């Protein structure tokens, strides 16, 4: 069926990140263009006095630091990788916490872990974004994002970790459209348990250490 104005208001009122999920769903379904979603997002933030945690100046500083630290300039898709990781770190600060330490990145062809969340980005170019970690860290990561406690890794923990990746990737897709005129779509997330991820093209693994454990973020272009 169709999404009504009342449905939109109810969804927007539920949780801080729900308006992002709603917007990305509407874009994926063709109900909104990326430009329309961006306008609606700005209007919603203004009406509800929602502000980004990081200013434009801070974003530029973060962007430059990431580029210098990870040496993405050596990769043919340097701009894409730098923009993606800048957004990722902003969303980690916003949704998970700023108590993390970025570790040196490595170029990989495959990666094995107890839990891997995968989402593909398709369009003018193709990319793959992943979160890989052990069970304890995976559950703690989901707890921070959901602001709930979990006792075991189950479908809800998977859905929560997948929701973080989808929110981040959805915002990345919107930014690519608005800032660079690049139209992209997202595939549904996939989950691997005790598996190994095989990657094509250039793939960077970016470890991030939190007090609760190490998360490995992978971006392949």
Each model region followed by its residue ranges:
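Non-catalytic accessory regions
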Residues: 1-83, 90-99, 110, 162, ...
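Short, highly charged low-complexity linear segments
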Residues: 35, 52-58, 149, 184-204, ...
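Intrinsically disordered, low-complexity segments enriched in polar/charged residues with Gly/Pro
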Residues: 11-12, 105-107, 193-195
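Short, hydrophobic/π-rich interface segment
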Residues: 154-203, 210
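Short, charged low-complexity intrinsically disordered segments located at boundaries
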Residues: 26-28, 55, 117-124, 172-174, ...
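A generic "cationic amphipathic patch" detector
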Residues: 39, 105, 181-182
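Generalized protein targeting/export and membrane-interface segments
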Residues: 53-155, 207-221
């Amino acid at each position: 069926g169709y999404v009504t104005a009342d449905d939109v208001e109810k969804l927007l009122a539920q949780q801080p990140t729900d308006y992002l999920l709603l917007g990305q769903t509407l874009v994926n379904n063709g109900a909104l263009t990326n430009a329309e979603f961006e306008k609606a997002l700005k209007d919603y933030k203004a009406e509800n006095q929602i502000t980004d945690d990081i200013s434009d100046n801070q974003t530029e500083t973060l962007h430059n630091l990431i580029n210098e630290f990870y040496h993405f300039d050596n990769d043919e898709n340097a701009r894409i990788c730098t923009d993606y990781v800048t957004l990722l770190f902003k969303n980690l600060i916003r949704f998970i916490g700023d108590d993390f330490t970025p570790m040196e990145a490595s170029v990989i062809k495959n990666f094995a872990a107890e839990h891997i969340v995968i989402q593909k980005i398709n369009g003018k170019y193709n990319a793959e974004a992943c979160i890989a970690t052990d069970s304890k860290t995976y559950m703690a990561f989901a707890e921070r994002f959901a602001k709930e406690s979990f006792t075991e890794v189950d479908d809800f923990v998977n859905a929560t970790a997948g929701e973080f990746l989808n929110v981040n990737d959805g915002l990345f897709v919107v930014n690519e459209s608005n800032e660079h005129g690049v139209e992209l779509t997202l595939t549904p997330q996939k989950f691997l348990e005790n598996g190994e991820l095989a990657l094509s093209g250039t793939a960077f693994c970016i470890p991030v250490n939190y007090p609760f454990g190490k998360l490995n973020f992978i971006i392949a272009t």
